[in-house]
């Protein structure tokens, strides 16, 4: 069925078609609904690291894009008040004192004083719904700004968490490289002694030097990447470049299996960017209603009452009042109003297509995130096995070398394999963290609107 039904279209928006989408029962084809969903948890429940929690809270408080989004919400809330006030009568008052001096031929100058005080009220009778549609549009823009702010929050939480775990992984990789570099340095010393003692040829010695030099060359690049990542996090947190306090990457902790492959499609209603797109669609529909109403007459009723006299002592002896019925109607504008109405319909169609595209993109993002998460969980397990096997391989190679069964080149190969396995395992743990972040973001986790708040917003 249609994603949602547009309410109260009437004659004004009868050409506004609903989004044409047939939403599947589950996000993953052939999947099933799961009662325990990652999106049901707040971000503070997902990321237990206290340093990361503090960093996220600081980012949500100080990030300039976040502050801009909050200011936009406040702006549109005030603008909605302006538009809503147009539906009610407006009251005004005016007091005045005029004096005119004039002279006819040779006669004495004449002074004409005029004192007045009047109050009035005016009200536009909204026969064709122009003001009501404008109010609906302002409400939609305001609610859309709230959802956009939530989307910004969701994006920032994901961005900070991603950068934090990438930084921790770089720290861990640097530790591995430094430890391996020291191992290769010791290997160079031993290989040189064996070569100079005539126990081996020069080849193992040169090979050990190559391994040491290539490993040492990785250090400056990693140190640079760490500094750049710290600068990125500082920018997200609304600060100047500085060092970032962080924990070590825990390669032993694993995320629990918080979700299965079948996630109910209703969870996509959590996505604030999708909800913002829905509000933009409602605002475009309201613009159609305003353009339709502008093709018809406007009726304004006003009433003015006051007192006026030319002497202050008799000021209250000259009361007056009068009503005014003002009817303004477009007569002949060479099709301008009709063209504006038709243009607003096409603007609505653009928003509708963009909304449909956004829904498709959201389904794709969630499918991609689920695939990435499943793959990352499997890979980190396999990389852990590879690291364990590589460690045992090094131990066995050293034992066999010491007993004369293999050459020193075989030991170097085993140590090189173990080094690569350590790096790959560290990166796979990082990728699992990033995958859970991506899935959490794709599901719109942590930013669902309470039911009571949703009902209030719709009134």
Please annotate each region the language model reported.
Residues 67-68, 84-85, 125-153, 203, ...:
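Sec/SRP-type N-terminal targeting helices
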Residues 109-113, 317-319, 420:
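Short sequence motifs at beta-strands and strand-loop junctions characteristic
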Residues 10-161, 298-303, 324, 334-341, ...:
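Short flexible linkers and secondary-structure junctions
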Residues 185, 213-242, 376, 384-443:
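Short segments within alpha-helical structural elements
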Residues 94-100, 122-124, 170, 211, ...:
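Outer-membrane beta-barrel pore domains and translocons
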Residues 1-61, 139, 223-269, 442-459:
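Terminal intrinsically disordered/low-complexity segments used for targeting and assembly
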């Amino acid at each position: 069925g249609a994603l949602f039904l547009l309410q109260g279209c009437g004659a004004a928006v009868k050409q506004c078609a609903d989004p044409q989408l047939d939403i599947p029962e589950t996000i993953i084809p052939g999947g099933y609904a799961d009662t325990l969903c990652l999106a049901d948890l707040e971000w503070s429940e997902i990321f237990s690291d206290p340093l990361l929690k503090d960093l996220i809270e600081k980012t949500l408080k100080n990030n300039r894009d976040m502050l801009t989004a909050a200011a936009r919400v406040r702006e549109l809330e005030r603008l909605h008040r302006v538009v809503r006030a147009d539906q009610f009568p407006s009251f005004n008052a005016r007091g005045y004192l005029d004096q005119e001096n004039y002279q006819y031929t040779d006669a004495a100058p004449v002074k004409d004083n005029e004192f007045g005080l009047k109050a009035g009220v005016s009200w536009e009778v909204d026969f064709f719904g122009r003001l009501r549609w404008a109010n609906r549009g302002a409400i939609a823009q305001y609610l859309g700004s709230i959802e956009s702010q939530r989307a910004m929050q969701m994006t920032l939480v994901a961005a900070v968490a991603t950068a934090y775990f990438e930084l921790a992984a770089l720290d861990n990789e640097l530790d591995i490289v430094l430890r391996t570099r020291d191992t290769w340095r010791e290997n160079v010393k031993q290989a040189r002694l064996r070569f100079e003692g005539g126990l081996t040829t020069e080849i193992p010695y040169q090979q050990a030097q190559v391994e040491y030099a290539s490993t040492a060359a990785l250090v400056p690049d990693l140190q640079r990447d760490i500094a750049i990542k710290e600068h990125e996090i500082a920018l997200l947190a609304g600060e100047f470049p500085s060092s970032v306090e962080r924990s070590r990457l825990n390669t032993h902790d694993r995320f629990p299996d918080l979700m299965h492959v079948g996630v109910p499609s209703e969870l996509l209603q959590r996505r604030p960017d999708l909800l913002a797109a829905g509000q933009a669609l409602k605002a475009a529909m309201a613009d159609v209603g305003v353009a339709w109403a502008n093709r018809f007459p406007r009726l304004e009723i006003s009433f003015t009452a006051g007192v006026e006299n030319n002497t202050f002592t008799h000021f209250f002896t000259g009361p007056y009042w009068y009503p005014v019925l003002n009817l303004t109607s477009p007569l002949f504008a060479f099709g301008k109003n009709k063209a504006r109405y038709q243009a607003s319909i096409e603007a609505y169609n653009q928003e509708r297509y963009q909304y449909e595209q956004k829904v498709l993109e959201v389904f794709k993002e969630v499918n991609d995130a689920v695939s990435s998460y499943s793959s990352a969980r499997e890979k980190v397990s396999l990389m852990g096995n590879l690291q364990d096997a590589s460690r045992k391989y090094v131990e066995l190679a050293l034992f066999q070398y010491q007993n004369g069964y293999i050459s020193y080149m075989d030991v170097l190969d085993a140590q090189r394999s173990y080094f690569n396995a350590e790096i790959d395992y560290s990166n796979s743990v990082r990728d699992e963290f990033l995958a859970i972040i991506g899935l959490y973001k794709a599901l719109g986790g942590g930013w669902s609107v309470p039911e009571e708040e949703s009902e209030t917003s719709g009134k």
